[in-house]
Every structure is written in structure tokens, then in C-alpha cells.
């Protein structure tokens, strides 16, 4: 089951970590979009997670990612690591048995993100800022003409308005996970663990907050969610930043997913109705929807774009733009 190209390195890792060269039991773990191969293994009657970064994985900063993971593990946010080798692309960590999420999951996530964002030692992404990546992807989406103008021209115009006023201040960047979706959150019955730190780097705090909010925060719980994160009721400016980032990410994820699907040759039906936002995310949490399939990616793209389209036509969008713009200009 372990790829032949990794078998020697895995045997060496097992020997260094546990003094053995064989695994008692091994089972593949699936569900994410990462190119890494992940397994649950048993060594000396204890379960561990084995993660293998495969050749051809997207270029990044493996050493920086592992340093971030080590920092998170030492802080008790990521599971304990038993072995890590960036050159071989091998990680062995504690395997956390998942329990059902608690009723107050939104508050728990917010408090966990506050701990993540207080960490030190994370680096900026080597390929440029997150905002630059967003702009590049949205531009590629626009150039690809994957949807008719009457569905996306307004989105592009309002996205541009948003990005003109949204702060890009490096001094505000914090240690970020950048992929806080259910597949990367494991609740053990007492505490929440974040796994898969492949995308970890310094970023705007509202990225993590917005990603997790898609899954766990209903509109009427926004104030409680942000208060749990900040430790005090959020200011109107903080609410506005959070709200605008959510809209920017709706456009970004819609663009990313449709461009990815188009490059894979997946048909895109511009007239297909978008699934309900909350229902689709509930099905993602339960595992009913598998985002590794091209069809699900297209559906999820339409979910995000429909959400953005609804919000850019609301008074709150205009108010948030004005508030953030006025704060940026003193």
C-alpha cells in the first residue's frame, strides 16, 4: 500500500521513531484535496498518522510548513509529531480518534483560531501574498469565460471595489492555518485538533475566520463567533473586515474551483441551480459530498458564487465597504 518509492524511507522513519521497521496494520485515509497520501498505521498496538508527500506535489516550502506544524504541535493545537523529514516527505504523528462535533463548535473553532493566530515563527508564503494569489486566480477565471457575462460581470466589478479598500498591511499578518475545513479539524471529545498544515503561513486573520464560518457559523451567530475569537465583542470595523473577507473568498473559491474543473475537462452548466449554501456545507461536514469529484467541485463553485452574488447587492456590503475605506484613510 505504501508506494514503492517511499518504502525505504518509511522503514527508516519507523526505525528512528519506534525501533521497528514494520507496520502491524495500515489503512488509507481520504477526504481532502491534498496530493499527499495519508494513512492510519498501527505500531506496537498504538495508532499513528503517516503522511507522505508525493513527487509532483505543488511547489511550496516543505521546511517552512513543517516548522509551522512543529510550532502548532508544541502549542497543543496539532497532534504530537513522532517523526518528520522534509527531504523524504514523511511525517508520523499521533492519530486522533474523531468524535462528533460539539453543539458549540463555532465558539470552539474561534477560540482555537485565536490560539493559532498567537503563534510565532510562521513565514510569509514564498510565492507571494495571499491577496496577489486571489487576484491572479480571479483574473484567470474572468479570462476563461466559463460563465456568461450576466452571471459574473457584476461579481467582478464588486470584487474589484472590495479589493481596492481591503487593507493589505503586512504588520497585521498572523500565523494562519489557511485550510480550516472539517476534514482538517478533529474533535476528540474534549479538545479540537487542527491537522494538515500544508498551507500554513502568515496571512490575514480573517481568512481563517471566514473559511471556518462557512461551515459552522450561521448569520445570527456571527457576533458570538467573533466575540469568542477576540475575547470581547467585535467592533463594527472588525465585523466589516470579516464580512468583506467572506465575500472575497466566495469569489476566489468559486473562481478556483471552476478553473480547476475546466482544466480537467469537466462540463460546466451555467444554467444549473446552485445548491443551498447551508445544506451543502452540512453535507460536506457529514462526508455526504466528496469534493474530490469534478461534479462536486463545480457545484461548490456555484454555491460560493451564488452566495457572493446575493451579498454584493445588500446594504451591508455598501456599509462595510464605506467603513473599511474610511478607516483605511484615517
Please provide the spans of the model-predicted regions.
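Active-site activation/catalytic loop segments of kinase-like enzymes and analogous catalytic loops
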Residues: 206-237, 247-266, 277-292, 296, ...
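Low-complexity intrinsically disordered segments
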Residues: 323-329
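ATP-binding pocket architecture of kinase catalytic cores
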Residues: 28-154
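Glycine-rich, phosphate-binding/catalytic loops in enzymes
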Residues: 66-67, 193, 210-213, 272
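A general structural signal marking secondary-structure boundaries and capping sites
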Residues: 76, 116-121, 166, 216, ...
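An alpha-helical support segment within catalytic cores of ATP-dependent transferases
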Residues: 5-25, 121-178, 188-189, 233-239, ...
Amino acid at each position: 500500500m505504501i508506494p514503492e518509492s517511499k518504502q525505504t524511507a518509511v522503514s527508516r522513519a519507523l526505525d528512528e521513531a519506534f525501533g521497528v521497521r514494520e507496520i502491524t496494520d495500515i489503512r488509507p485515509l481520504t477526504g481532502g484535496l491534498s496530493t499527499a497520501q495519508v494513512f492510519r498505521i498501527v505500531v506496537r498496538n498504538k495508532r499513528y498518522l503517516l503522511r507522505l508527500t508525493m513527487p509532483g506535489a505543488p511547489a511550496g516550502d516543505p521546511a517552512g510548513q513543517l516548522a509551522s506544524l512543529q510550532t502548532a504541535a508544541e502549542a497543543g493545537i496539532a497532534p504530537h509529531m513522532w517523526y518528520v523529514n522534509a527531504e523524504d516527505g514523511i511525517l508520523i504523528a499521533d492519530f486522533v480518534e474523531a468524535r462528533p462535533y460539539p453543539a458549540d463548535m463555532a465558539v470552539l473553532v474561534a477560540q482555537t483560531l485565536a490560539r493559532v493566530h498567537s503563534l510565532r515563527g510562521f513565514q510569509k508564503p514564498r510565492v507571494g501574498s495571499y491577496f496577489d494569489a486571489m487576484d491572479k486566480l480571479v483574473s484567470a477565471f474572468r479570462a476563461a469565460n466559463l460563465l456568461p457575462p450576466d452571471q459574473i460581470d457584476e461579481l467582478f466589478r464588486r470584487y474589484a471595489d472590495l479589493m481596492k479598500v481591503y487593507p493589505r498591511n503586512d504588520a497585521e499578518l498572523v500565523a494562519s492555518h489557511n485550510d480550516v475545513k472539517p476534514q482538517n479539524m478533529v474533535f476528540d471529545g474534549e479538545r479540537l485538533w487542527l491537522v494538515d498544515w500544508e498551507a500554513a503561513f502568515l496571512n490575514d486573520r480573517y481568512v481563517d475566520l471566514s473559511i471556518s464560518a462557512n461551515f459552522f457559523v450561521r448569520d445570527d451567530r456571527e457576533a458570538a463567533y467573533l466575540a469568542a475569537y477576540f475575547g470581547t465583542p467585535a467592533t463594527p470595523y472588525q465585523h466589516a473586515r470579516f464580512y468583506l473577507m467572506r465575500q472575497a473568498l466566495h469569489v476566489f473559491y468559486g473562481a478556483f474551483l471552476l478553473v480547476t474543473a475546466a482544466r480537467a475537462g469537466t462540463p460546466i452548466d451555467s444554467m444549473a441551480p446552485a445548491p443551498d449554501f447551508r445544506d451543502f456545507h452540512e453535507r460536506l461536514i457529514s462526508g455526504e459530498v466528496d469534493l474530490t469529484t469534478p461534479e462536486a467541485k463545480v457545484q461548490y463553485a456555484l454555491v460560493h458564487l451564488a452566495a457572493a452574488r446575493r451579498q454584493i447587492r445588500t446594504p451591508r456590503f455598501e456599509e462595510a465597504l464605506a467603513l473599511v475605506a474610511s478607516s483605511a484613510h484615517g
